[in-house]
């Protein structure tokens, strides 16, 4: 795994949101252990999730968010993706920047 997360925590966090529309990002961040990580580790996680290295996490990358933690994880539903984006995108540009991502995890 990345950002120093424990495999058992990742497995438990993924299991908790395996059903469609059960993903709640704040619960996931806490369960997977990201919420308690240093800002450095949180930023490392951001750069993994930002797959096209644009400096932003776009909606299509958010949809595949869980697959960064396990290749067999499901894609997020449209409703989950939009809720995740709405909470993280504070400046309304339709993307989540690294500072927005860190603020969301540390909230």
Swiss-Prot record:
Pfam families: EF-hand_7. SUPFAM superfamilies: EF-hand. One of its GO terms (molecular function) is calcium ion binding. PROSITE patterns: EF_HAND_1 (PS00018), EF_HAND_2 (PS50222). The keyword NADP does not apply. Keywords: Acetylation, Calcium, Metal-binding, Muscle protein, Repeat. Residues 37-72, 76-107 form the EF-hand domain. GO terms for cellular component: axon; axon terminus; cytoplasm; dendrite. Ca(2+) 2 binds at residues 89, 91, 93, 95, 100. Gene3D superfamilies: EF-hand. It comes from the Eukaryota. Belongs to the parvalbumin family. In muscle, parvalbumin is thought to be involved in relaxation after contraction. It binds two calcium ions. This is one of two major parvalbumins found in the white muscle of pike. This parvalbumin has an isoelectric point of 4.10. This is Parvalbumin beta. The lineage of its organism: Eukaryota, Metazoa, Chordata, Craniata, Vertebrata.
């Amino acid at each position: 795994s990345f950002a120093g997360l424990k495999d058992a925590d990742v497995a438990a966090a993924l299991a908790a949101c395996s059903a469609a529309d059960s993903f709640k990002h704040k619960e996931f961040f806490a369960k997977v252990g990201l919420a308690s990580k240093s800002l450095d580790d949180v930023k490392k996680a951001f750069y993994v999730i930002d797959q096209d290295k644009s400096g932003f996490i776009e909606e299509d990358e958010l949809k595949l968010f869980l697959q960064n933690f396990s290749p067999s994880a499901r894609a997020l539903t449209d409703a989950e993706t939009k809720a995740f984006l709405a909470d993280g995108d504070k400046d309304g540009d339709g993307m989540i920047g690294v500072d927005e991502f860190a603020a969301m995890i540390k909230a």
